[in-house]
């Protein structure tokens, strides 16, 4: 009897040992997003909670929104990535190219600000951004200037030689700034003629340099070359963390909404787990951690921000009521023409 019991016990141990690799093996899931501060915030503070709860490893594939989309298009039938973060303009292109699949109907979608839900829930905003006005606080203090208050301040002659503008053909910040100014000149997202035709006599004379992206801003602020420029509160916060003397001003006409959207990648290898990750990233706990770790402004109305973020942004509910939402379908339909005209006419 004892021998039989021992044999049975050993058999059970070996059975468990043989089965262990099957049930303890960790799956890997891939998410595409911007590198830098965003990647650091998510990998250090947000994604570990999902990994622990689901016994998975989440690997970030870093890159700009355009880079991530290019990877999706190159491998659309067997994509490596399961979920992607894309700037809203690029996401609109991704959706039109059929690389996203609809989000599952989940309670978390009802917790989002209404503008963060994409049409037919093909994706959703995971981080709220807004392009407003960044300015050099050291320079403004030395000159005795009050902080800027309007998009039309870019055309104020007192800022001659101190305006830095990102290229509208390569930067969402630059495009947003141009469209906001175009709107105040009588244009719209469908009609950019006022902005193009009046630029050379309004904003143009004040511009010291057009830059392809915002990477050069920290250097130009420190040397005093850059005084005023389109930028987001999150980007301003990142520069402040490096000791760069910058501030953010919300234009009285309203900042321009800049969402980072997420979508579940069509044809991904584990759609059920991908949907679960998407729902987690849209949740209040995940977005609260992203806010604390990387100044990511939440799209979930139940998420919380740090006191410093609240002080800098003010009441978020009031702020989002004033943001300008651009028509990405119209913009993307004409973007190639606008880019050529910008490069030829504005940055010649």
Each model region followed by its residue ranges:
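Extracytoplasmic ligand-binding site segments that recognize negatively charged/polar headgroups
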Residues: 36-43, 80-81, 85-219
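Mature extracytoplasmic/periplasmic domains
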Residues: 265-323
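Extracellular/periplasmic bilobal clamshell ligand-binding domains
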Residues: 307-348
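Short beta-strand->loop
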Residues: 101-110, 123-124, 152, 228, ...
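Periplasmic-binding protein-like
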Residues: 129, 197-203, 210-211, 242-266, ...
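Early extracytoplasmic/lumenal segment of secretory-pathway proteins
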Residues: 25-92
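A ligand-binding cleft/hinge motif common to bilobed small-molecule-binding domains
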Residues: 89-93, 222, 227-245
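A bilobed periplasmic-binding-protein/Venus flytrap-type ligand-binding module shared by bacterial periplasmic
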Residues: 134-139, 182-184, 259-271, 289-290
């Amino acid at each position: 009897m004892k021998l039989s019991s021992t044999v049975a016990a050993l058999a059970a141990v070996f059975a468990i040992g043989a089965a262990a690799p099957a049930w303890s093996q960790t799956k890997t899931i891939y998410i595409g997003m911007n590198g830098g501060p965003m990647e650091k915030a998510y990998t250090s503070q947000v994604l570990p909670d999902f990994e622990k709860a689901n016994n998975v490893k989440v690997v970030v594939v870093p890159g700009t929104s355009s880079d991530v989309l290019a990877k999706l298009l190159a491998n659309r039938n067997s994509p490596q990535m399961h979920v992607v973060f894309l700037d809203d303009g690029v996401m609109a292109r991704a959706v039109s190219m059929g690389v996203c699949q609809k989000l599952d109907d989940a309670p978390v979608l009802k917790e989002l600000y209404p503008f963060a839900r994409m049409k037919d829930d093909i994706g959703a905003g995971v981080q709220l951004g807004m392009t407003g006005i960044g300015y050099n606080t050291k320079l403004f203090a030395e000159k005795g200037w009050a902080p800027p208050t309007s998009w039309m301040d870019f055309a104020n002659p007192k800022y001659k030689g101190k305006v830095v503008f990102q290229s509208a053909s390569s930067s969402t910040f630059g495009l947003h700034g141009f469209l906001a100014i175009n709107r105040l000149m009588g244009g719209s997202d469908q009609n950019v003629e006022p902005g193009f035709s009046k630029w050379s006599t309004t904003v143009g004379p004040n511009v010291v340099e057009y830059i392809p992206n915002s990477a050069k801003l920290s250097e130009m602020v420190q040397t005093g070359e850059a005084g005023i420029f389109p930028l987001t509160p999150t980007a301003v916060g990142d520069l402040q963390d490096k000791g760069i003397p910058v501030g953010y001003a919300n234009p009285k006409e309203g900042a321009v909404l800049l969402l980072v959207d997420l979508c579940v990648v069509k044809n991904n290898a584990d759609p059920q787990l991908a949907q679960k990750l998407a729902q987690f990233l849209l949740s209040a706990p995940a977005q609260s951690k992203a806010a604390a770790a990387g100044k990511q402004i939440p799209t979930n109305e139940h998420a919380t921000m740090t006191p410093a973020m609240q002080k800098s942004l003010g009441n978020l509910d009031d702020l989002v009521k004033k943001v300008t939402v651009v028509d990405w379908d119209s913009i993307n339909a004409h973007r190639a023409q606008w880019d050529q005209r910008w490069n030829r006419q504005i940055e010649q």
